[in-house]
Amino acid sequence: MGDKDKSCGRGIVILAGGKSERFQSQDKCLSTLNGLPLLQHTIDRVAWVAPNEVIVAARDSEQGEEIRNRITGDFRIVFDYFTDFGPLSGLLAALEHTRCYHCLVIGCDMPFINPEVVEFLFDIIAASRYDAVVPCWDRESGMLEPLHAVYRREPTLSAIKNVIKEGNRRLSNVVAQLDVYLLPVDKIRGIDPDLKTFTNINTPAELELHHH
């Protein structure tokens, strides 16, 4: 990997530090689907879209070591700044350790994420002045996919710091401070008709459902 001072156009940020109570003692990102950890599936599907910068945000050095031992590929590990703080902690750490202008931000549990959809999101933000491109299921109800979205680094970093300073820890509060293009998911169906790209694994039962 290049060092953190090297600028690049695209980066991938994968948030792996969250604890999932529904997975009990298991670490969700290392839970196995069809022979590979969920995190491995996720990295393998998106890394080629931004091969110069893939960052995995882990909750601590213990999890980081486990990831390093079990996951292959060219990626860097950063550690959440705060304990039990939700996705903002890992996202803040990752954005402070990269110089990429635009970053895809995703969870570690998206084994079917579509790299062509990711490419589409990067193309939209590169051709615009928006701070973020966030897929949207329903604008009125605010059903968004903020953990399957592309963000411009600088304004997003500022927004995260503002939100944390206000005592909040929700990613939706960050999105609310940004100039966001809400991309209707129907515009993605031409690439991914069934929108499998948004499938995330929340429970062991869902994991079992996708085994083959």
Give the predicted meaning of each segment:
Residues 188-212:
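Glycine-rich phosphate/pyrophosphate-binding loop and the adjoining helix
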Residues 3-197:
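Nucleotide and nucleotide-moiety/phosphate-recognizing core
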Residues 2-11, 204-212:
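SAM-dependent methyltransferases
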